[in-house]
Design a protein with these regions (language model features):
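A short helix-loop-beta-strand connector motif used in the catalytic cores of GNAT acetyltransferases and
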Residues: 68-81
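Short, P/G- and charge-enriched loop/turn segments at secondary-structure junctions
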Residues: 14-16, 67-70
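Acyl-donor (CoA/ACP) binding surface of acyl/acetyltransferases
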Residues: 1-45, 79-203
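Conserved GNAT-fold acetyl-CoA-binding loop/helix
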Residues: 46-67
Length: 203
């Protein structure tokens, strides 16, 4: 699989998040015109929460779009929408947040619309995001927490090369119940053949 990346201003992602491209996908920061596609995506029953504690609506997603830009400028994290095809259809959302002040460790969430699961979109997206995190951001470790019952997502992370580190018992509240989550990790030194060059490291 051939993957190319375009990273304008990648040396300072806090000032401007670059656009990353691969054969199937283009990743860019959310903008106001993404409102309705994101409302639909985040309203899915199995959607990642991305910080939402209540059912999403237009107002909450508008606030989310503004908040992710603020989080990026302060260095707390960054968010990409995943688009695909000639029409640049919004088909997913990826967010990476720092878990320590120096961003040595980050946590990511990725959500794809059902029609794009199992198509290769996730693996291309993950390779771009992982390479950006380890290269431009300079992180050493990337974690992911996935509901144990989500076999497809856990299988995709395993295929990516992530290591399962344990089960977080009843650690996620969804609706009226608490779910177990699988803790996965990716390390910079293990990224190896998945690497996609996205520019120089941020110091």
């Amino acid at each position: 699989m051939s993957i190319n990346s375009s990273a304008v201003g990648v040396s300072d992602w806090r000032a401007e998040l670059p656009t990353l491209t691969a054969g199937l996908v283009v990743l860019r920061e959310p903008i106001s015109k993404d409102l309705q596609p994101l409302v639909e995506l985040l309203s899915l029953a199995d959607a990642c929460r991305f910080g939402f504690d209540e059912p999403v609506n237009d107002v909450l997603v508008e606030q989310f779009i503004a908040r992710v830009r603020q989080d990026r400028t302060t260095g707390l994290g960054f968010t990409f929408v995943v688009t695909t095809g000639p029409a640049a259809t919004v088909c997913g959302l990826v967010q990476v947040r720092q878990l320590d002040p120096s961003f040595e460790t980050g946590e990511w969430e990725c959500m794809l619309a059902p029609a794009f699961r199992g198509t290769g979109v996730f693996l291309e997206t993950a390779r771009l995001v992982g390479s950006f995190v380890f290269d431009a951001v300079g992180a050493h470790r990337l974690e992911s927490r996935v509901p144990l019952q989500n076999g497809r997502a856990n299988g995709a992370l395993r295929k990516l090369g992530a290591v399962q580190e344990g089960i977080l018992r009843r650690s996620l509240r969804r609706g009226g119940e608490y779910l177990d989550q699988v803790l996965w990790s990716l390390l910079k030194e293990d990224w190896g053949p998945r690497w996609v060059s996205t520019g120089s490291r941020v110091h």
